[in-house]
Amino acid sequence: MSKQPENSFSSDKFFPIKQKLALEAVALVEPGMCVGLGSGSTAREFILALGDRVRTERLVITAVASSRISQLLAEAVGIPLLDHSLLQDVDLVVDGADEVDPCLRMIKGGGGALFREKILLQSGKRNVILVDERKLVPTLGKFSLPIEIAPFGCSSVQRILNKQGYFGEWRETSAGERFITDNGNYIYDVRTPDSYANPEEDMIRLLQIRGIIDVGFVIAKAEVWVGYADGSIVRKKEHNEY
């Protein structure tokens, strides 16, 4: 069984880079905006920075959180949240990613919120993905590919995945229990194959399997902001070799 990735936050040596990326991104927020809040350690820093602006500048905005964890943090720092069932257009979505290839295709879902994160990105007028340089890869697949699967018939879905050449493990919590997403589903972390030259094809193939809710590939219009150890930030908007 695969374990749910643990948050390290300030113990991460790239923590200052995540903070800098978050501060750069929060400057994009303008009064009256609806802001999509991603999940994960970098999105956490963005939420904290946005909360500071709401508090110190009396910034009037609304936000939609992609996970229960992000929702609780946003509430704690005073960010007004929109009922997610009322979600329509989102002016700005800020999130992170687990991997980004040279075509800006991504793998997301290390925190288990991939389905809601992708709905936010689909609704976003402007999507900004914040990553540090470790997340840049020549080909997707170094990080496991999360697949969100409905509990009903999940063993059958796993059997079909294995027959098609996708092998992995069911994600567990640190307590050794089956990880359950905010939507009440499971996560199957695919380890093999470990390289996806054409993720669009894999995504189409996987989504045809009944019981699969969503796949961790993200092929969406988004800006990717990359933070480097030297303190620089590079903003990528289209195919760009590293």
Curated annotation (Swiss-Prot):
Query: Known Pfam families for this protein?
Result: Rib_5-P_isom_A
Q: What is its EC number?
A: 5.3.1.6
- Which residue ranges does UniProt annotate as crossing the membrane? none
Q: What cystine linkages occur within this chain?
A: none
Q: Which GO terms describe its molecular function?
A: ribose-5-phosphate isomerase activity
Spell out the CDD domains in the cross-references: RPI_A
Q: Which residues form the active site?
A: E117 (proton acceptor)
Q: Which InterPro entries match?
A: NagB/RpiA_transferase-like, Ribose-5P_isomerase, Ribose5P_isomerase_typA_subgr, Ribose5P_isomerase_type_A
Q: Which reaction does it catalyse?
A: aldehydo-D-ribose 5-phosphate = D-ribulose 5-phosphate
SUPFAM superfamilies annotated for this entry? D-ribose-5-phosphate isomerase (RpiA), lid domain, NagB/RpiA/CoA transferase-like
Which Gene3D superfamilies does the record match to this protein?
Answer: 3.30.70.260, 3.40.50.1360
Q: Which residues bind substrate?
A: S39, G40, S41, T42, D95, G96, A97, D98, K108, G109, G110, G111, K135
GO annotation (BP), single: pentose-phosphate shunt, non-oxidative branch
- What UniProt keywords apply to this chain's record, in alphabetical order? Isomerase
Q: In which pathway does it act?
A: Carbohydrate degradation; pentose phosphate pathway; D-ribose 5-phosphate from D-ribulose 5-phosphate (non-oxidative stage): step 1/1
User: Which interval of the chain is the signal sequence?
Assistant: none
On subunit structure and binding partners, the annotation says: Homodimer.
Stated family: Belongs to the ribose 5-phosphate isomerase family.
* Functional description taken from the UniProt entry: Catalyzes the reversible conversion of ribose-5-phosphate to ribulose 5-phosphate.
Protein name in UniProt: Ribose-5-phosphate isomerase A
